[in-house]
Every structure is written in C-alpha cells, then in structure tokens.
Amino acid sequence: MKNNKIIIFDTTLRDGEQALGSSLGINQKLQIALALENLGVDVIEAGFPVSSQGDFKAVQKIASKVKNSTICALSRALDKDIDMAYEALKVAKHFRIHTFIATSTLHIQDKLKKDFDEILSMAKRAIIRARSYTDDVEFSCEDAGRTPIDNLCFMVENAIKAGAKTINIPDTVGYTLPSEFANIIKILFNKVPNIDKAIISVHCHNDLGMATGNSLSAILQGARQIECTINGLGERAGNCALEEVVMAIKTRKDYLQGFYTDIKCENISKTSKLVSAITNESIPSHKAIVGSNAFSHSSGIHQDGVLKNRQTYEIISPSAIGIHENRMLMTARSGRAMIKTCLENLGYDENTYNLDDVYERFLRLADKKGQVYDYDLEALMFLSYESEEENEFVLEKLSVISGNIPTACVCMRIKEELKTEACTGNGPVEAVFNCIARITNLKPVLKAYSINAKSSGVDAQGQVDVDLEFKGRKFHGKGLSTDVIEASAQAFVSAYNAIYRSLKVEERKMA
C-alpha cells in the first residue's frame, strides 16, 4: 500500500477503563482526553455512552472540548446503542461511531444464541444505521482471531458493502501468535474483493504477551490502524501499549517499511505518568519505554559501555519520549569507571583522590544501602566511614491524630538531645513533615512521595519513598513499616540525614 501512515486509535478511556477498580470521573476522563489530543492521537475512543449516564456525559463533554482528534464512541449492533452514541458525539468537530458484534462460532452460539446469518444481518443493519449519522463508521468483528477465516472474510466484505470505512480485526482474548495473526490479515487482503475500500484496523489483547507483536505483524500485511492504550491498560492482561508500538515503528523503520505515526513522541513520558496518576495504576519499573528502569543502568559492564557510547546499550534516546536524563544507578554492581565518571561530574579531579580507596568504601556503603546517590558519593570524599553511617537525626516517637484538623507529634533525638514538636497539616503526612522541618530547622521542599506495598494481607508492610529538594539538589529517603505514617516519617528522616551530611561536606569544602 502507498500510504505508510499508521493511524493511532487510543482506547484508554473505554477499554483501558474496564481494567480499573472504579470508573473515572468526567473531569478525569476529559483531562486524559486532552492529553491524548496533545500527544497527537488520531482517534480517541471516549467511552460506551449507552452503558451509563456518566459515560454518556463524559463522551459528550470530551466531544465538545477536543478539536484535533476524532472522537469515537462504542456501540453494540443495536439501534438504541447507535442512537445514544450519536447523541453523545454530535457536538464533536470530528466523530466516529464504532459498532461491533461477535463473529466467532463460540461467541455466536454460546453467548448470543444465534447463527452466523443472523449476526451478519445485525451487523449490516447496524452499519447502515450508523451511516445515517456519519460517514465515519467503524465495524469490529469481535473475537476475529478465533473466527473461521471464510466467515471472517464474508463478514468483512459485507460490512464494507454496508458502508463501514474502518474494519477492525480484534484478537479479543489475546489468543493468536504474531505469524498466525499476520496470516489472518494477509488472507483478508487476498480474499476480500473490496478490501481497498476500507482501512483495516487491529485491536490486540495481551493475554499471551503478544499484543504489540501481533499489532506490528498486522501492519506488515496491510493494516493501517492500531488500537491501543496508554501503559497497555485494559481488561485481564491489558491491551497493546501505545508507547510500545509507536516507538517500535519509530525505532525500526528499517524493518517496518518506513511506517510512521503522527504521535508527538516527546510527550509520551508525561502522558504515561498522567494516566498512571489519574487511574491510580502504577507503571511497572520494567515496563518497556515508560518504566522507571527503561533507561536505567546498574551493571558495571553496561554502565561502562553507555559512558563510552550510549548506543551500546540504549536503542532509544530517553529524550525521544521526553525524558531528559538516563539513570546510571550506583549499586554494588557498578564498576570503577562509573564511580570515576560520577566524581568527575561532581567536579572532582582524578588527581585529588585515590580511586581504589573511594571504590572500596563505595562498595561497603552500596552493600548496606543498595542504591548510592551522588551526595552519598561526595560524602565518601570528605567524611570518615563512621561519619558516613552516622545519623544526625533519629526518630524516637510519633503520634498522629486524624480528623478535621490532622495533628502530629514527633520526638527526635539530635545527638544526645531530645526535641519534640506538634504541628498540623492538610493531612497526617504533611503534619509529620512540618514537625520534622521545625525540629531540624531545615526547610526542604517535598518533590515526590510514593507508597508501595511490600507484602499482602492486613499486616502488609508499606514502603514510602520521598524526594526532598534542598538548595537546588534532590535527596532521597526511604521508610518501611506496617504503619504508612510511620514509614513516611522514617523516609523523611532518612532524607533529612542525607541533607545534613551534604551540609557537613560543604563545611569541609570551605575549611
């Protein structure tokens, strides 16, 4: 085919939302839709209007606000669904009605209790009704991956005759393998006589981990639309991840025949984080493209390679998706080259220190802490081993009262002196933070706060990680407890001790 543009159809707000424990609010959905528009998504599937009044209103509001993306709504092959979709969409500058019906023998017989001819008739009738509202109609053959190929070809041919401009071939249960799914698309192009009258779309689920692979294999056989979600959100194991297919197409143009998308890749990272925050679905650290470890290197061999030439272990530049740094994690696996480079970045000439000595001390600290930060490394240059391990601030006691005015009382030991303060805050965590700031007489800014469960059950331990900014530098702290407020206090105190050690280093520099 001459047109190598791949249309990106995002269904985060419809299929992606089905994976969430609770529905998103209208304003939350609008916020995501506007981010998708800014990302350059061609088609935004905003919801399923007939499913609830809330979904109807959300689709309607998105349709009224988004101007640069086509807004799509889903409907079953039923008149009431299609009519409701139109009512929600009609205010949009560009809109699409997406209707579907199952085509696999299993679904037709066991779920719908009908035969193939009845399903064919329903599909054609639905497409014709949708066409009465708009020329932009998409039809999906649900469970196409398990539909007998002759039936699928016949359904697609008749759907195009009825007026569908986009035909979607979903691997609804993530059953097919890439070569198998590619062959389905290939057969459609070979056997459906009017296939050139429509755009072929694919919608792949990730039950066997094949969603991205199946989608890419399909465009090699002629598909020109990929349906996907931010962070791969979706029912069961999720959907094809937008960030994965887009960056695969961008990175492997040599193999993927010059295909391209209109996605503004530099907005991928921030869109991923926004969706994660709004949906309260954390991004796995090892997630391709957008995971926190996607551009991290901790192995000494890898770090040495990246320091010499980033392409040795990075096939994508972090800046390509809007990340302006790659993380070179200092751990016990890091080599001397990494430590030397970090010290150079901190301004230390190699003639002013003994690398072997610093590296030995670094390993002792890394074995204890796990991850070492630049301020820890700098402390190695000026402080004795005992001073490195010394904590100026120690949390002794903590009590919190929640309610209309959250209040915390914190007792800390500073050297041999006990100091106690009570403070209020917008919540118990802020109240604790205010207490510690007052006791230490240090005023950092809280830049990041996260909680992760480290076990399950009612006695689960929660790990709190915080980043505090002080004098233009970030300091990390970590706490672990079955009480999340106590874990927060531990994390704050940990970061405050890092700040204190950095101040001692500054004093030594000035001496």
Curated annotation (Swiss-Prot):
Mn(2+) binds at residues 15, 203, 205, 239. Pathway: Amino-acid biosynthesis; L-leucine biosynthesis; L-leucine from 3-methyl-2-oxobutanoate: step 1/4. Keywords: Amino-acid biosynthesis, Branched-chain amino acid biosynthesis, Cytoplasm, Leucine biosynthesis, Manganese, Metal-binding, Transferase. It is an enzyme of class 2 (transferase). GO terms for biological process: L-leucine biosynthetic process. It catalyses: 3-methyl-2-oxobutanoate + acetyl-CoA + H2O = (2S)-2-isopropylmalate + CoA + H(+). Its cofactor is Mn(2+). One of its GO terms (molecular function) is 2-isopropylmalate synthase activity. One of its GO terms (cellular component) is cytosol. Homodimer. Catalyzes the condensation of the acetyl group of acetyl-CoA with 3-methyl-2-oxobutanoate (2-ketoisovalerate) to form 3-carboxy-3-hydroxy-4-methylpentanoate (2-isopropylmalate). Belongs to the alpha-IPM synthase/homocitrate synthase family. LeuA type 1 subfamily. This is 2-isopropylmalate synthase. It comes from Campylobacter jejuni subsp. doylei (strain ATCC BAA-1458 / RM4099 / 269.97). The gene is leuA.
